[in-house]
């Protein structure tokens, strides 16, 4: 028989060693015996015994031989028996080096798994490609060390339980040796259920839950466990490319960020928290880790996605399905919490959406703290000296899901997930080219930095702990936003939405977009390659054409030159792209509105400017992420630095403020923020004669009806603010202003709030007029240039 390759670690050095051979076929045992013969030849004075490792689900009788080998009296003396080394050994089978995507898919078929070939296939491999067979040895441990670990961590006392413990430790050591050869992408937690159920810590917590049983906890662990397999890992990239086949095949990464993250992941376990705009995100993160040969992530997902054949496949590739509503199930909450802690303790990486669900508006949602609190508990309990919260920014040039999101905004119901839904989703990915997928990894946030050392004060102060969690989560989200590149899709959509259906020529699009690009360059904001191409007319044409045919831009070619516009029915879809870039223009938009407010303010206009900037920040806090108050003021001051002696000019007021705004490039508030205040104003108008404690569903229905009336009357600029998604945050604003609760002066305060919003909308009108004057001046200058040619 041709000799197989042997791993460098598969060397025995101890004088007395028990080799535990994990084998599935006689061929594998032959290979291990051949390897053991080599070890004996190298160390003739050492004693090597070999025992076949019982399978995981073997009956108790199968452990008898191992029980005897572990007995202190089995060796020449009890002491020498305890000093005996245990070394697990197995044969791993590598897949063919030139395997295609089709080959990876075919591995799902019975008898085609390259990692677990049949005995007949094994003999053929040894004849034709013996390098695919590797004898590997796991890390050794003394019997005394294993016995002490067993006593310290489990509730078991019987010698047969100790043998089971040693078996599990052997299999775990082999798994570590295996992924060192196969690659970090194959690293996964093994034997989670038996390890946790045998844990003294887990059983003690279980005893404190009324009515809880080990059997019920075991069923929940079965539901959570991933059942990881190498074939499924290989399929992650195949399925990921299938689900994203409408995009460029190569994801766009920042190589410096990838290198920094790789170094960080070598030091600490991490939770990868990704922005969530599409179901595709669920495959982007695993594929990104594989692309860059980084350790895999164990993705949390709603159990609603565990359907058909996809459920088992996703589970075996690292997906952890969790129930949606667990508030009234203390046992499930406990099992989930302990499962998260166990995975973190074993230094595996977790991942989920920091927003908890897809953002259907294009902007980031507030972070959800549910799973984060479990990770924090694991850290504070000392299961790791630090845990990194690694933000992941995922953005797209285009998404086919915006049609669905636009329907949601108009009040449609969510389509339930299922096989038909999955088929339609994957089918839609191949209908056209959607551009690139951009993946960014900003600097990770240290849990230790925000929560202090393990076992610290926060363990005894739930309120302080929750506040620290909120600050930590917002910091992760803030870093995600700062790393998210601005796309051409977002800039073009934002510009065309401001025209309210009026078409623009290529030259008009090009010269108007340059101010935004100049601003992003000054601020050193990250931009996509598609946005960089907007510097040229060809790049603008490519971006506008990519959005044409109702995706969501309409192109008209019947005249002297093509023109582009957004039809009313496509405004909600275009708004998704526009909202994805607001973060880059948020503070400069607030500056414009604060200047407009100061123009008609009485008294100290500088003070009025600052007061209004802070007020706008407060009103918008449910829709957008902001820096803390001190940093926000510093950012606003930096935004004003473009105008020399701005406070002096602001204090004069009148035409000076007009001149300041006219000189500002770009003017973005109308494009970026008007729609949100229009939605707030619609809700405020509904509240004028609504019951004090009106419910969210009734408020939304009334706002939709009134909003449609306002669109018909021209009282709002477009149909975009008439959105269930925007009304949801508008209601949060109203609750924050204490306008949805009985009070003696409620009616007066509701009227005052609507008046305040109308005054803000008046400021939008003022800034918009100046922006139009800028556009006319640019257009006049451009025409003069064309006339000279």
Curated annotation (Swiss-Prot):
GO terms for biological process: CDP-diacylglycerol biosynthetic process. Its EC number is 2.3.1.15. Pathway: Phospholipid metabolism; CDP-diacylglycerol biosynthesis; CDP-diacylglycerol from sn-glycerol 3-phosphate: step 1/3. It is an enzyme of class 2 (transferase). It comes from the Bacteria. It is found in: Cell membrane. GO terms for cellular component: plasma membrane. The keyword Repeat does not apply. It holds the Pfam family GPAT_C. A motif (HXXXXD motif) lies at residues 276-281. SMART domains: PlsC. One of its GO terms (molecular function) is glycerol-3-phosphate O-acyltransferase activity. It is a peripheral membrane protein. It catalyses: sn-glycerol 3-phosphate + an acyl-CoA = a 1-acyl-sn-glycero-3-phosphate + CoA. Keywords: Acyltransferase, Cell membrane, Lipid biosynthesis, Lipid metabolism, Membrane, Phospholipid biosynthesis, Phospholipid metabolism, Transferase. Its main location: membrane. Belongs to the GPAT/DAPAT family. The HXXXXD motif is essential for acyltransferase activity and may constitute the binding site for the phosphate moiety of the glycerol-3-phosphate. This is Glycerol-3-phosphate acyltransferase. It comes from Mycobacterium bovis (strain ATCC BAA-935 / AF2122/97).
